[in-house]
Structure formats: structure tokens, C-alpha cells
């Protein structure tokens, strides 16, 4: 089958009429579309699904977790923390019950991902001392929360009280699971001083959190799967400050 010609020229004795067959307005001239330079890396990362391996097609996670419904809601927690050698804990799954875009509708919701952004920094009196201090972050799931969050020393077993060797105690392994572990380092001294370090982590979780009938966003109102962020620095005498913004992206459950 022959291709349709781009245009047809109809010749008459009086005039020549050029008829266009692209069905657009005859009064608009053709404007050249701006060309965007695409690199090989962008072409490879944005390739269609049929060009990816079978694993990407079979085990592709859905946008909305199973058993949940949209829209995607966001809850942020901003605070400055004094991180010591003995550790500190904050609850990052505190969500108030309500009808807003930052509230949970009922008792159950699924935390799809969490975004930790901020920095750790030293005081003016500490940064001139020759030392290296590393802050260890542990994102922990508490399967059976009750009362108040347990301290760092109660959950983790550290050799010689060193947070870098922290592991969950044997009798608490069924209750606490470390979902992600990361760290950031600052260095003090007159030379090669690094008084602050950035913290930027995006973590995919898909953790189903269950509350009781209360509306307040508190740890004691959790009944299942509370998310806790434990922090501890490796230096015993020099504390570190952490200015963090923790954002959780969650979906409401259909069982509410």
C-alpha cells in the first residue's frame, strides 16, 4: 500500500491551489519544536518496561501498597537533638487522627517510605578539639509497643558501651527489628576540621502501623509496628547536635 502524499497540488488554468492533508489550521505556520539533548544515561534509566529484565516486570512494587488507598499523605517531624554516647530515641510514626492530608483516617495506615534529611554539627567549644565523632542511626520497627519507648541501652547490646558495635539484644529480637542503619561523621581540630556533616537518606519500608482508638499522635497509642529512630555518637565525652527533618509518606488502610 502506497503512502499518502504529504500534500496534493491541484492545478487549474486560473491559479494553483495547494491543499494540505495534515488537518491542521492553514493559517498557522510550522514551528520547530525545541530539541532536548538526552544523554545515554537518561535514555537507559528511562527505557520502557519491555526493555527491562523480567525481574523488573514480575517484582514491580505498586504505587499504592496492598490493602491501602490514596492519596499519599505526608507527616513531618522537625527538631534539634542532643546526641550523646548513651543514645537517644524518637518516634517517627506519630500521626494524628483527622481528615487532613497529614492525618490518618482510622487506626491503620501503611508507611511506604521515610525521608531523613538534615545535618549533624558540633558546638564552638568542641570543634577545636582533635577528635572524630560518628553518629550512628538505627531505624527500628517495634512490633509490640507499650508504655514509653525503650532507651538505646535497653534495646541494643554494645560491647564496651560502644554504639558502633550495637546489636539488638537476644531476648528482644522478636520485638525490635533494625530496618535500616546508617551513619555520619564529623571531625574536630585545628587542621582538617569538618564541623558539620549532611544527613540525607530515603528509605522504602512498607510498614503497616496500627493505633488504638485514641486520636493523639503518641507512642503509647500504638498497638503494632511503631517506627523508632535511635541515635548515638561514638565519642564518649564530646556530644553532637543533630538538626533533622523526618518525613514519612503513608497511605490509609482500606480496613479503617
Curated annotation (Swiss-Prot):
It is found in: Virion; Host nucleus. Keywords: Capsid protein, DNA-binding, Host nucleus, Metal-binding, T=1 icosahedral capsid protein, Viral penetration into host nucleus, Virion, Virus entry into host cell, Zinc, Zinc-finger. A motif (Nuclear localization signal) lies at residues 40-54. A zinc finger (unnamed) spans 68-85. InterPro entries: Gem_coat_AR1, GV_A/BR1_coat, Viral_coat. GO terms for molecular function: DNA binding; structural molecule activity; zinc ion binding. The keyword DNA-binding applies. A motif (Nuclear export signal) lies at residues 101-122. GO terms for biological process: symbiont entry into host cell; viral penetration into host nucleus. One of its GO terms (cellular component) is host cell. Its main location: virion. A motif (Bipartite nuclear localization signal) lies at residues 3-20, 200-247. Encapsidates the viral genome into characteristic twinned ('geminate') particles. Binds the genomic viral ssDNA and shuttles it into and out of the cell nucleus. Plays a role in protection of the genome from degradation, virus acquisition and transmission by insect vectors, infectivity, and systemic movement. The CP of monopartite geminiviruses is absolutely essential for virus movement. Homomultimer. Binds to single-stranded and double-stranded viral DNA. Interacts (via nuclear localization signals) with host importin alpha-1a. Belongs to the geminiviridae capsid protein family. It comes from Tomato yellow leaf curl China virus (TYLCCNV). Gene3D superfamilies: 2.60.120.20. Pfam families: Gemini_coat. This is Capsid protein. Coiled coil: none annotated.
Amino acid at each position: 500500500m502506497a503512502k499518502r502524499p504529504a500534500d496534493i497540488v491541484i492545478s487549474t488554468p486560473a491559479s494553483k491551489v495547494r491543499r494540505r492533508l495534515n488537518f491542521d489550521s492553514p493559517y498557522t505556520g510550522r514551528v520547530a519544536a525545541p530539541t532536548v539533548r538526552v544523554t545515554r544515561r537518561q535514555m537507559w534509566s528511562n527505557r520502557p518496561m519491555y526493555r527491562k529484565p523480567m525481574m523488573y516486570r514480575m517484582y514491580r512494587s505498586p504505587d499504592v501498597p496492598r490493602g491501602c488507598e490514596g492519596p499519599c499523605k505526608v507527616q513531618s517531624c522537625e527538631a534539634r537533638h542532643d546526641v550523646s554516647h548513651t543514645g537517644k530515641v524518637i518516634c517517627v510514626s506519630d500521626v494524628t487522627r483527622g481528615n487532613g492530608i497529614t492525618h490518618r483516617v482510622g487506626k491503620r495506615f501503611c508507611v511506604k517510605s521515610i525521608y531523613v534529611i538534615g545535618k549533624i554539627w558540633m558546638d564552638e567549644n568542641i570543634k577545636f578539639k582533635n577528635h572524630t565523632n560518628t553518629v550512628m542511626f538505627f531505624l527500628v520497627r517495634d512490633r509490640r509497643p507499650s508504655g514509653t519507648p525503650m532507651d538505646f541501652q535497653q534495646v541494643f547490646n554494645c560491647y564496651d558501651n560502644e554504639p558502633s558495635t550495637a546489636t539488638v539484644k537476644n531476648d528482644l529480637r522478636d520485638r525490635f527489628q533494625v530496618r535500616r542503619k546508617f551513619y555520619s561523621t564529623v571531625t574536630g581540630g585545628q587542621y582538617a576540621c569538618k564541623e558539620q556533616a549532611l544527613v540525607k537518606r530515603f528509605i522504602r519500608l512498607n510498614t503497616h502501623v496500627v493505633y488504638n482508638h485514641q486520636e493523639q499522635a503518641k507512642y503509647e497509642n500504638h498497638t503494632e509496628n511503631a517506627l523508632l529512630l535511635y541515635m548515638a555518637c561514638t565519642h564518649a565525652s564530646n556530644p553532637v547536635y543533630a538538626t533533622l527533618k523526618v518525613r514519612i509518606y503513608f497511605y490509609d488502610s482500606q480496613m479503617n
